[in-house]
Design a protein with these regions (language model features):
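Juxtamembrane/disordered regions of integral membrane proteins
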Residues: 1-109, 119-129
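Active-site-proximal N-terminal segment of extracellular/periplasmic enzymes that hydrolyze or transfer
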Residues: 130-189, 430
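His/Asp/Glu-rich, glycine-adjacent segments
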Residues: 130-132, 213-380, 494-500, 504-507, ...
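Beta-strand elements within well-structured catalytic alpha/beta cores of enzymes
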Residues: 150-170, 184, 210, 364-370, ...
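Short, structured active-site-proximal loop/turn typified by the sulfatase FGly-forming signature C/S-X-P-X-R
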Residues: 171-208, 213-217
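Active-site neighborhoods of enzymes that stabilize oxyanions during catalysis
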Residues: 228, 235-249, 257, 261-268, ...
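A long, amphipathic alpha-helix that forms part
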Residues: 344-345, 349, 357, 365, ...
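Acidic/histidine-rich catalytic neighborhood
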Residues: 403-501
Length: 658
């Protein structure tokens, strides 16, 4: 699927240009009809005004984007919005009654409404997939920046869809919700493969393994390091930086000139945008956003689509309540705005970062898109609005695919996921109380502190906000001291962690039963708990269930096997996790029902990941047919790193280290 390297410049198509011009004129004409104190007498006048604005836009905004202004996101948005209004006022002054605008404020409102109408008309007339103008500007910025690399050595683009399971992708391909990826497979250009994540099936652990080759001692999304009584979280910038420091060994996937876009960890990339572990490097101005601001329509379009996404979420949530859809997640408060930020703003910034990287010829690019994961958590993994988020991602992948024709080197595209998701009503919805409540009432003594909620999407939006304002939040210390807590209970999807802080080391099964006689039995016998991982002083690591136990050192089963409904590799994953320095005193896995394909999260997410059971352990790799996979199954994120880095070395040989 790699295009022959031709260093072709994007060419403007006259008919497409004419149609876009007429669409812009129609949108402006409608906006002037809606907004008071703005008047366009005839459609011909709208055509003239739209031409003037197009010329001014082509002259001014690429210049603003190309010069080295300290472009934070907020400053860039404000500059473009102000220029949009000023260009309308300029058109009013340059024409003889083609348009009349009373003031700057009315001009700004007209520009916003015209953008909203343009978005609708672009979809109706099929002009929303033409990136020719944008690519021409990005290419010009790349050449003038001095960063453009022109070579025949192929590059590789890794596009991660956070939280998408292989069976969900296959059904989306079949049903028309992923047409670009379906076409790649149907034409024989790409193939699909499955891999299995580690016990902690969440982005922090998976990206540590995929991008750095190791995720040792990452037992969950959040965990306690008992020796220092500190809590680590895979979305806190300081903790992500520490996680990267522990695992970076010089063989990161993106070493030697690579680019990280929208990731928790950087893969040792030289170029980063929206990368949580490198927040210090990203504070303030980021030249990576110049491509986005090179076209004024991007800004107004993003604002329009942001509020449209908020409206879509409100209507979808209301429809779910009206139809009494179950399971049903919490979707009120700030969540609609969080969803809109992930599905529109962050997504588009990452796409433009990738397009810029390709036209500059970066050798390796890894970008994470979390909109599907975010919507699925609250709506369900295959609900209509969730699949619509996937369809929009697929549309963006089509843009990236088409941009290869104009890049300064050939590119291969690999699409993968870091984990899947499993669905089901939460533990609290089923029981009326949470895991922390169950633990607290089963203790002999002690107060329980529960931690759950929050995910990598919160981190990404927070990072975007801090970049937007130029604020330096990298030195803020996370509230992670748990030295004054007696018992800490954490939920990471359907994986629970119980830390008994009375000892600064992991307690054995015998110690726990001696000090808290009711705790283990209350947990293992609960109908919505599938297994417990504890360490016995006598028997070593053991998985306990309501009807039996599996002794992991010799794989002996006594009674019913608590891991029977899980992957054949479940015991391997538990043995590995048991060896981590900071594994919890008690690791708790929810039940999994293979008939209904459901489990339950220990946090308030109806579609979840983080543990074992169901589609959360079935992520995918969509790879070029010219690449080869190992003969053995791909188990663990570090194994994926080996595959992806091997493909990069296959393309680039000794151009990368290691």
């Amino acid at each position: 699927m790699t295009p022959e390297q031709r260093l072709v410049r994007p060419k403007i198509k006259p008919l497409r240009l004419l149609l876009s011009w007429l669409v812009a004129a129609a949108a402006l004409f409608v906006a002037a009809w809606i907004v008071p104190h703005v008047e366009i007498q005839t459609f011909l006048g709208a055509v003239v005004v739209s031409l003037i604005i197009a010329v001014l836009n082509a002259l001014i905004l690429p210049l603003v984007a190309a010069i080295r202004l300290p472009l934070t996101l907020v400053l860039g948005f404000l500059i473009v919005l102000i220029l949009d209004a000023l260009m309308l006022l300029a058109a009013s002054g340059l024409t003889d009654n083609a348009i009349e605008v009373d003031s700057f404020g009315w001009a700004l409102l007209t520009a916003l409404i015209a953008s909203a109408v343009t978005v609708v008309l672009d979809v109706l007339f099929g002009t929303n997939d033409d990136d020719t103008y944008t690519l021409r500007v990005i290419e010009r910025i790349a050449r003038r920046s001095g960063e453009r690399i022109e070579t025949e050595v192929p590059g590789i683009v890794f596009l991660e869809i956070d939280g998408l399971a292989l069976p969900v992708l296959q059904r989306a391909m079949r049903d028309g919700n992923a047409p670009n990826m379906a076409r790649w497979v149907a034409e024989g250009d790409h193939r699909l493969a499955e891999w299995e994540p580690d016990l902690s099936s969440q982005t922090g652990a998976s990206q540590a393994g995929i991008l750095h080759g190791s995720n040792e001692n990452t037992p969950a999304f959040r965990w306690v390091e008992k020796a220092t009584a500190t809590m680590m979280t895979c979305s806190a910038p300081a903790d992500c930086a520490e996680l990267e420091r522990r695992h970076a060994t010089g063989v990161g996937l993106l070493t030697d000139g690579g680019a990280s876009r929208g990731n928790l960890l950087s893969g040792e990339a030289d170029h980063v945008i929206l990368t949580v572990s490198r927040m210090e490097a990203e504070k303030g101005a980021n030249p990576g956003y110049r491509a986005f601001f090179s076209n004024g329509f991007n800004v107004t379009r993003v604002l329009v689509l942001f509020f449209w996404e908020v409206f879509l979420e409100w209507t979808a949530a209301s429809r779910a309540i009206r139809r009494d859809v179950r399971p049903r997640g919490h979707r009120s408060g700030l969540y609609p705005f969080m969803r809109a930020a992930m599905c529109v703003v962050v997504r588009d910034l990452i796409v433009y970062g990738v397009l810029s990287d390709m036209l500059k010829g970066r050798p390796a690019i890894y970008a994470t898109f979390s909109s599907y994961d975010e919507v699925a958590h609250h709506s369900g993994l295959e609900r209509a609005d969730t699949l619509e988020a996937l369809r929009k991602l697929d549309q963006q992948f089509g843009r990236i695919d088409r941009a290869r024709t104009y890049s300064s080197r050939p590119y291969e595209i690999v699409v993968l996921s870091d984990h899947g998701q499993t669905q089901g009503a939460t533990f609290k919805q089923r029981n009326g109380y949470g895991l922390e409540d169950l633990v607290e009432r089963s203790l002999a003594s002690g107060d329980v502190t529960g931690f759950s909620g929050g995910d990598e999407q919160n981190a990404m939006v927070g990072l975007a906000v801090s970049e937007a304002t130029g604020a330096d939040t990298s030195k803020k210390k996370p509230k992670n001291d748990v030295s004054d807590r007696q018992v800490v209970v954490m939920g990471s999807g359907n994986l629970g962690l119980v830390y008994l802080m009375e000892e600064r080391r992991r307690m054995t099964l015998e110690e726990i039963e001696g000090r808290h006689p009711a705790l283990i039995s209350a947990l293992r016998e609960h109908p919505h708990v599938g297994w417990l991982l504890v360490r016995s002083e006598k028997d070593g690591p053991v998985a306990l269930g309501g009807g039996g136990a599996r002794y992991l050192e010799d794989d002996r089963v006594d009674g019913e096997d608590p891991l029977a409904n899980l992957s054949p590799n479940a015991a391997h994953h538990l043995r590995r996790t048991d060896g981590f320095a900071d594994v919890a005193d008690i690791m708790v896995g929810s039940f999994y029902d293979p008939q209904l394909d459901e489990g339950c999260a220990f946090e308030e997410l109806i579609s979840f990941h983080g543990g074992m059971g169901g589609l959360q352990t079935r992520p995918f790799i969509l790879y070029p047919a010219s690449f080869t996979l190992p003969d053995e199954p791909i188990v663990g994120a570090a194994a994926v790193h080996g595959v992806l880095r091997g493909w990069r070395q296959q393309l680039q040989g000794d151009k990368i280290a290691g």
